[in-house]
Amino acid sequence: MVAYLDVAATTRVDPRVADVVLHWMTEDFGNAGSRTHEYGTRAKKAVQEARTFLAGTVGAKTEEVIFTSGATESNNIALLGMAPYGEKNQRRHIITSAIEHKAVIEPLVHLQSKGFEVDFLEPGLSGRIATESVLEKLRPDTLLVSLMHVNNETGVIQPVAELAEELRGTPTYFHVDAAQGYGKLPEDLKAPIDMISISGHKVGAPKGVGALVTRRRGWDKTPLEPIMFGGGQERKLRPGTLAVPLIMGLYEAAKVFQEGQPRWEREALAMRERMLAALGKTRFHINGDADHSVPHILNVTFDGLNAEALIVRVKDQVAVATGSACTSASYTPSHVLTAMGLPDGVANNGLRFSWFPSQVADFDPEEFAATVVRMQPDAP
């Protein structure tokens, strides 16, 4: 069986989650917006229970969570939804990083075409944006800072909790794309972050569900305007019939992950140590700051090896990736590794390993390393 080391792209749905989803699809299948019968009442109550739990995982209030189809939609609502407020108040400056997911970069490029000024900060070889570099760019007209929690290609953790404290009390709003970090580093997201994007399928929930947390500042709501129209659901910020089975799947997945997080972290770190020990027999370089990375994502380049050729060679052994699944059809160098200042030869050949410990029992790092050694040309 091919070992799966691509959980940064998506995870297997936990069987307990699948059972919950099936229940809400086939038994309690009511519309949460139906108020005239018990099917709808049960669905609405269940959604509110899920909302309360998710809010608690990031230290938010129940009413501050809206359900979406995933982190891409959450990012778009957060970024494009802030634009009218920025225009009205002559605050058209936004700060972000050049290593963000395309679901952040592309909405911001769109805002540039509408007259917004966006600073895309580059992190350097560490892959980590310094808090000071963000603060140095702040201006009186800065509307928003948007920074990912964990980079999806390198696994490098960004200093979002520290930055949130620095931005507290300023008029600048702070958005965090937590698609890769939610559940793994729970304390970071309890910092005073105005908006948090969450993805379900990165923690064992089905694809097609996520959330956007929009915290109040005192009594004031985050000044978001809807980017879609057609109903009053989710505070009118995300109209449409609620996908109750998927929401309940996200709820169950978040509970399961929260309960198992300490063990998951220990086992993920143990797997990382096994990987690094085996790869030590090859000639390789870690891309990104290994001291500020999540334990389950590792991005490396092997000297003299083409990453695509290696993937083809080991396709019957292990499933790995060269970068983000959302851009894997593109043959351009990784925009993340390029923004870190790595040359095209490295940026073209970064290989990302990402794992959940429970899903890699069949993977032998030593066997993989032996394949790499056989493929690598002799050292000059």
What does each model-identified segment do?
Residues 1-380:
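Pyridoxal 5′-phosphate
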